[in-house]
Amino acid sequence: MATATPPPQDFPPYPPFTSLRLAAARDVAQMANLSVQGFKDSEIFRYERPGHDQYPEDAVAYFANLYRDRLEDPRAVVIVAEDWDGAERVVVGVGCWILPQDSPRTGQFVVPCVGDREPALDRDLCCRRLELFNAVTKATEERYLDGKVICDKFVVHPSYQRRGHGTAMLRWSLRLCTQDTVDQGVIPSHVGEPVYLSLGFEVIGEMHVPDEGDTQGFTQRVAVYKARQT
């Protein structure tokens, strides 16, 4: 006896896009490249990837695989911003959010057939620092961001910053949170923090990344957008 195909799940509508769209599998390479360009001067990137100048291609492979994972993740939402590069439209910004475990949108934004993972040599990485950072981040999220939408990745290519792409992506995510009455949390970089605060996020705590050998650690603040109060 043939097995009946289950009916498609009825998801709630999401806010409409104007200049943005949901990410697709064809965007992975552009998302990876712009993420390296946008993140490489951040305190996190420098801490984790001391060998980047020697092996720049390794970070690109890492981000390509990360975005493939996110596109297939039932709890992830990935959107992109586009702009002109000559006569061609290119991806210039990426926003990625992780939904709470009980979200009715789980599975809504899954992208199939994202392609094979690339060999990730990670020669630029300091594995010890990566372990430290991941452990501290996990503990911080469990303490401050449990049950919230978490802003996982948020970046605009340096050549296209100050054109409103970052603000547009973040505003869309806030409309989604407001519609679902779910708060959003983030542990932003020092450079990115003002963008969040300008749109209504409030600082509620700190995350301390420890020194590792001769490498100095750093502190980032934790911020939350309280959608339930809007």
UniProtKB/Swiss-Prot annotation:
Top-level taxonomic group: Eukaryota
Pathway linked to the protein: Mycotoxin biosynthesis
Has keyword Transferase?
yes
Name all N-acetyltransferase domain ranges: 143-230
Entry GO MF terms:
acyltransferase activity
Alphabetized, the UniProt keywords read:
Acyltransferase, Transferase
Note whether Thylakoid occurs among the keywords: no
Enzyme Commission code(s) on record: 2.3.1.-
Q: What else is known?
A: Trichothecenes are sesquiterpenoid toxins that act by inhibiting protein biosynthesis.
Query: Which PANTHER family does UniProt cross-reference here?
Result: GNAT FAMILY ACETYLTRANSFERASE (PTHR42791), N-ACETYLTRANSFERASE DOMAIN-CONTAINING PROTEIN (PTHR42791:SF1)
- Sum up the protein's function in the record's words: Acetyltransferase; part of the satratoxin SC3 cluster involved in the biosynthesis of satratoxins, trichothecene mycotoxins that are associated with human food poisonings. Satratoxins are suggested to be made by products of multiple gene clusters (SC1, SC2 and SC3) that encode 21 proteins in all, including polyketide synthases, acetyltransferases, and other enzymes expected to modify the trichothecene skeleton. SC1 encodes 10 proteins, SAT1 to SAT10.
The protein's name is: Acetyltransferase
The species is Stachybotrys chartarum (strain CBS 109288 / IBT 7711) (Toxic black mold)
**Phylogenetic placement of the source organism:** Eukaryota, Fungi, Dikarya, Ascomycota, Pezizomycotina
Q: Which gene encodes it?
A: SAT19
